[in-house]
Amino acid sequence: YVLYLDGQLVASGCVPLGGDHISNDITLMTGIPLAQAELLKKTEGDANSFSGKTNEMVRVRGEGNMKDAAIERNVLNEIIRSRLLEIFNLVKSSLPKDTFKGNRCHGVYLCGGASLMRGVGELASHVFGVAISRPTLVKNGAPSYLDDPRYCTAIGLIRYAQILDAELPQQRSWLGRVLGLFGRKNS
């Protein structure tokens, strides 16, 4: 996470939890193989669901020699919701205490693959009490994967390195420095 207030970096850190932990939780709690747990999370899960259909079963086909898997929807959603609440509350507790008071914080951007899950934005908004967004890039003919929240952290780090590199004074070669002594420009 990174916190900017008034254009200044105020806090940053890492909560070493994410979407893969949700899939692991589903596997540990239900015995469903990890590949199927991941698929159930992505296709059937809802982080903000308070489904009244407590016994509704959701299913995912087994691949190869794996059996089909099934789980009650409310159990799946509760596993997802519990882990995401933990993640969001860990981030919130790591931030300065007055971050969300008054008009200091205008919103939260969600990144990573788990941010694409149903209900994640609503759950995050409930925890942080502010508007929730997902980062998007200005369209300039760039490949569509650059707009994908799963890649925004890596792309952001690359972009940050590019900006830092552009701000460094350009170093001239040895020959350019020697010629510079005589008033010639190195081209």
Segments (PLM) and residue ranges:
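Helical "lid/coupling" subdomains associated with nucleotide-phosphate turnover
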Residues: 2-187
